[in-house]
């Protein structure tokens, strides 16, 4: 039981970048897909229901898929967008993942445009 408590304390103490690395390890090595917010992912029964839910979405996550050839320019943009230090921004760009969470559509599109102009491959989720 003490081992589980120590494990829980270690997980709670992770930085954002360490949590991102843990997610990647669990996904790549063990095939465990994280569910957003602990929610159970269920496929929609009808195609129209999914389209309606997509239209109503007001908050978006900006996800970096690939830094591209101009990684230095992407790191500079990520630093400007997130306010992270150089090392943290570099680690985030190399690991990929969410740059910003829960932003309005206009802001998400603006961030996406900046990162794509720097050479990155970005998607809104």
From Swiss-Prot:
GO-annotated molecular function: mRNA binding; structural constituent of ribosome
Tree of life domain: Bacteria
This protein's GO CC annotations: cytosolic large ribosomal subunit
Pfam families: Ribosomal_L12 (PF00542), Ribosomal_L12_N (PF16320)
Keywords from the UniProt entry: Ribonucleoprotein, Ribosomal protein
GO biological process, one term: translation
Binding partners and assembly: Homodimer. Part of the ribosomal stalk of the 50S ribosomal subunit. Forms a multimeric L10(L12)X complex, where L10 forms an elongated spine to which 2 to 4 L12 dimers bind in a sequential fashion. Binds GTP-bound translation factors.
NCBIfam families according to UniProt: L12
Family assignment from sequence similarity: Belongs to the bacterial ribosomal protein bL12 family.
Known function: Forms part of the ribosomal stalk which helps the ribosome interact with GTP-bound translation factors. Is thus essential for accurate translation.
Protein name: Large ribosomal subunit protein bL12
The species this protein was found in: Ruegeria pomeroyi (strain ATCC 700808 / DSM 15171 / DSS-3) (Silicibacter pomeroyi)
């Amino acid at each position: 039981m003490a081992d589980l408590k120590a494990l829980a304390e270690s997980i709670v103490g992770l930085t954002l970048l360490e949590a991102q690395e843990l997610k990647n390890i669990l996904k790549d090595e063990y095939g465990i897909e994280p569910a957003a917010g602990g929610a159970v992912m269920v496929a929609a029964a009808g195609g129209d229901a999914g389209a309606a839910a997509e239209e109503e979405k007001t908050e978006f996550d900006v996800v970096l898929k690939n830094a591209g050839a101009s990684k230095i320019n992407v790191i500079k943009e990520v630093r400007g967008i997130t306010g992270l230090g150089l090392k943290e921004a570099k680690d985030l760009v190399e690991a990929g993942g969410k740059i910003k969470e829960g932003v309005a559509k206009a802001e998400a599109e603006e961030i996406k445009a900046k990162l794509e102009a720097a050479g990155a491959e970005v998607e809104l989720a």
